[in-house]
Amino acid sequence: MNIMKRQLCTSSKRFFSTAKNVVKYNTIQDIRNKYFTGTPLSMCTAYDFITATWVNKANCDLLLVGDSLAMTSLGYDSTITLSLNEFKYHVASVCRAEGSSMVVVDMPFGTFESGISDGLKNAIDIMKLDSKVTSVKVEVGSYTKDKYAMKFIEELCSRGIPVMAHIGLTPQKVHSLGGYKVQGSKSLLQMQELYETAMQLQKIGCWSILIECVPHKMAQFITSKLSVPTIGIGAGNGTSGQVLVISDLLGMQGDSVPKFVKQAVNMTDIATQGLKEYIASVEDRTFPERGTHTFKVKEDLWNEFLSSINEK
């Protein structure tokens, strides 16, 4: 058995049939292997073919199709408004991008709250959208209070559906949390419950846990006690990896970003300046430039055309 495990991890030979010319992308085992080396994991959101192409070209380990697209791409004021049908459209678009990034997909608000059976059906539908969808992500509150979500996650795991759990600040539960606030920092009980929730999620089968807006000491401690990778956002650098919303990371909505975001570039300024230059070149007729941006027709054919309509 151990020999077979070593072969599966190191041999170049396949142990399964596959379609021709299938592009390889990261699997959960690939992510685990990197996690065991101690190398931090990289994860970024993507919401369509273009942003997914960027994430893949950058060789990001994981790509999250997050329900945050409700606000960053669709203009809603919260993630709660997003419908499953709208979300599926974006998941399909993301999966058309080529590359090795492993695709993890959120389960938006309303996709599992009405009942376990409905939630299972929706999770299966999401997994079947494309073979690249490797895992779902489920937000969950304290294990002592959000027993339903814990049970739902356990049901998913027991059926072989990979789950990345999301603890700490969970945007889908923002109303019950009293707003977008740091979690696990106000009381001993809150800290204990956050820790125990992570332990319970590992126990019921989650392959990874995302920790959002939690004090760095707390996130680092939880990570040290788990044997599955943690992905942090606003949780310090003591987690197994990091995730950011692509529009925050690339400045696609200007300078207004959360405290925990290190903005790599301000694409809003770059795009706005580019558009201004385009408009100016249109108005002063320097674009399109003849010969550079235009096509030619043979002179004799042009003269023949003019003659044919009596304009010569």
From Swiss-Prot:
The keyword Transferase applies. It is an enzyme of class 2 (transferase). Present with 1420 molecules/cell in log phase SD medium. It comes from the Eukaryota. Its EC number is 2.1.2.11. GO terms for cellular component: mitochondrion. Belongs to the PanB family. Disruption phenotype: Impairs growth on beta-alanine but can still utilize pantothenic acid. Coiled coil: none annotated. Probable 3-methyl-2-oxobutanoate hydroxymethyltransferase required for pantothenic acid biosynthesis. Acts downstream in the pantothenic acid pathway. GO terms for molecular function: 3-methyl-2-oxobutanoate hydroxymethyltransferase activity; magnesium ion binding. It comes from Saccharomyces cerevisiae (strain ATCC 204508 / S288c). Keywords: Pantothenate biosynthesis, Transferase. This is 3-methyl-2-oxobutanoate hydroxymethyltransferase. Gene3D superfamilies: Phosphoenolpyruvate-binding domains. GO terms for biological process: pantothenate biosynthetic process. NCBIfam families: panB, PRK00311.1. It holds the Pfam family Pantoate_transf. Pathway: Cofactor biosynthesis; (R)-pantothenate biosynthesis; (R)-pantoate from 3-methyl-2-oxobutanoate: step 1/2. It catalyses: 3-methyl-2-oxobutanoate + (6R)-5,10-methylene-5,6,7,8-tetrahydrofolate + H2O = 2-dehydropantoate + (6S)-5,6,7,8-tetrahydrofolate. InterPro entries: Pantoate_hydroxy_MeTrfase, Pyrv/PenolPyrv_kinase-like_dom, Pyrv_kinase-like_dom_sf.
